[in-house]
């Protein structure tokens, strides 16, 4: 059977994943595979923080088992295979946890729980990445597929819960999270940076640290029970990385849990659309048609044209040094942008410069007799300051471009959960499902 839940946190506290940690401590069924953390449309206006739903496949484990984590000193195992066992009581175990831990006083927190004997059709997952789904639409979908749901307040969380059960897990990464309830001890920034750099030394991990911007990315909001989270391609490597961070940092923790995720998979990206729609995320190859311009706040914009028509690509202030490259684009450049289209702009998450145009500057001609640079005396009137000879045609010199074809990521501090950094792209090509050989 499958259980999923969503929308239990708020901007000021809690983390939906912590309810999974508590659920796994209480449930009497085995975990088949890994618990799942599924990120959905990053543009949805109702999201409380990271727009991630949780799900888990439950049953009676068979055969080889693997370590998922450690729950208050007890090792938690998962199984590659299992016999299905449907126990509707897990819905009410989860209900108690939602009532105990959710940020129900926050106006935009509207939890939802879903259970099902079978996974849902994957088309619903892709819809939840691409557009805004109504609560009534989610109710109908879950009911039509023989699932059951439980709503708190408006119950908007059933939308993400249904999508988490629909996720086909065709491209995957992992994240290991360490917890301390109600929140971890305060860790100074210098120590966070040191431990984030340490995590970054482990094979296949990513988005751990941004040294240039002094951002220790593995450490989230200290108001939640999450101490740190390390993302990567190999669960056994993540377990070793977490142990090293805990030991070297002398970190007091309650539990660790490894999740199978769709983070850094680009699942939200629609490839080369014919039409651009609001709240969707795209990969768009376009030609630059104007020079970039900036506005107050350090945001940069550039007009571009693709087969879907004209649009404005944007690099906002949080993308930091990425804006320097973005600002050097010129008319005629061909660029593939990746990003989300909101409020009339494509908010760029990364870009690949395919080709750069040749740029020429207009200069006064050299005197053929004196080899001296002439001076402009008016429109198409150039005179040699030495001999006085006149010329009516300017010279043009090619300007060396400050950028070149290549792949450009925004810095770690600005990366979104679903966006795949170019640095791990080759790993997906050789190991599509990010599973250990």
From Swiss-Prot:
This is tRNA(Ile2) 2-agmatinylcytidine synthetase TiaS. It comes from the Archaea. GO terms for cellular component: cytoplasm. It catalyses: cytidine(34) in tRNA(Ile2) + agmatine + ATP + H2O = 2-agmatinylcytidine(34) in tRNA(Ile2) + AMP + 2 phosphate + 2 H(+). It comes from Thermoplasma volcanium (strain ATCC 51530 / DSM 4299 / JCM 9571 / NBRC 15438 / GSS1). One of its GO terms (molecular function) is ligase activity, forming carbon-nitrogen bonds. It is found in: Cytoplasm. One of its GO terms (biological process) is tRNA wobble cytosine modification. Belongs to the TiaS family. InterPro entries: TiaS-like_TCKD, TiaS_FLD, tRNA_Ile2__agm2C_synt, Zn_ribbon_TiaS. Keywords: ATP-binding, Cytoplasm, Ligase, Nucleotide-binding, tRNA processing. Transmembrane segments: none annotated. ATP-dependent agmatine transferase that catalyzes the formation of 2-agmatinylcytidine (agm2C) at the wobble position (C34) of tRNA(Ile2), converting the codon specificity from AUG to AUA. Its EC number is 6.3.4.22. It holds the Pfam family Zn_ribbon_TiaS.
């Amino acid at each position: 059977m499958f259980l999923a839940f969503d929308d239990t946190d708020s901007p000021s506290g809690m983390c939906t994943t912590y309810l999974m940690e508590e659920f796994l401590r209480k449930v009497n069924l085995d975990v088949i595979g890994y618990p799942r953390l599924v990120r959905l449309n990053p543009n949805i206006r109702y999201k409380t923080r990271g727009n991630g739903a949780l799900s888990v496949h439950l049953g009676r484990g068979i055969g080889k088992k693997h370590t998922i984590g450690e729950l208050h000193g007890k090792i938690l195992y998962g199984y590659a295979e299992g016999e299905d066992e449907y126990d509707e009581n897990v819905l009410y175990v989860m209900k108690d946890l939602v009532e105990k831990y959710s940020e129900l006083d926050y106006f935009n927190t509207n939890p939802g729980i879903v259970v099902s004997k079978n996974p849902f059709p994957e088309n619903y997952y892709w819809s939840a990445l691409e557009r805004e789904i109504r609560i009534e639409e989610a109710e109908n979908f879950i009911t039509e597929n023989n699932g059951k749901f439980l709503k708190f307040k408006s119950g908007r969380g059933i939308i993400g819960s249904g999508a988490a059960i629909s996720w086909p897990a065709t491209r995957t990464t992992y994240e290991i999270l360490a917890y301390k309830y109600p929140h971890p001890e305060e860790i100074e920034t210098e120590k966070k940076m040191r431990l984030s750099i340490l995590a970054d030394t482990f094979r296949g991990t990513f988005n751990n640290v941004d040294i240039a911007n002094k951002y220790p990315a593995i450490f989230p909001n200290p108001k939640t029970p999450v101490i740190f989270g390390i993302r990567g391609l190999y669960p056994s490597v993540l377990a070793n990385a977490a142990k090293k961070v805990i030991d070297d940092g002398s970190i007091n923790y309650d539990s660790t849990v490894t999740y199978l995720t769709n983070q850094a998979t680009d699942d939200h990206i629609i490839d080369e659309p014919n039409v651009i729609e609001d709240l969707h995320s795209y990969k768009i190859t376009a030609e630059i048609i104007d020079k970039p311009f900036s506005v107050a706040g350090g945001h940069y914009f550039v007009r571009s044209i693709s087969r879907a028509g004209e649009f404005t690509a944007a690099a906002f202030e949080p993308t930091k040094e990425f804006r320097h490259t973005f600002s050097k684009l010129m008319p005629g450049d061909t660029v593939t942008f990746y990003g989300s289209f909101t409020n009339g702009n494509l908010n760029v998450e990364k870009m690949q410069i395919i080709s750069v145009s040749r740029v020429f500057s207009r200069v006064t001609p050299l005197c053929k007799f004196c080899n001296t640079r002439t001076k402009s005396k008016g429109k198409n009137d150039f005179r040699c300051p030495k001999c006085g000879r006149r010329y009516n045609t300017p010279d043009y010199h090619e300007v060396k471009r400050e950028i070149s074809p290549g792949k450009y990521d925004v810095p770690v501090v600005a990366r979104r959960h679903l966006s795949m950094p170019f640095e791990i792209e080759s790993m997906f090509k050789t190991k599509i499902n990010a599973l250990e050989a």
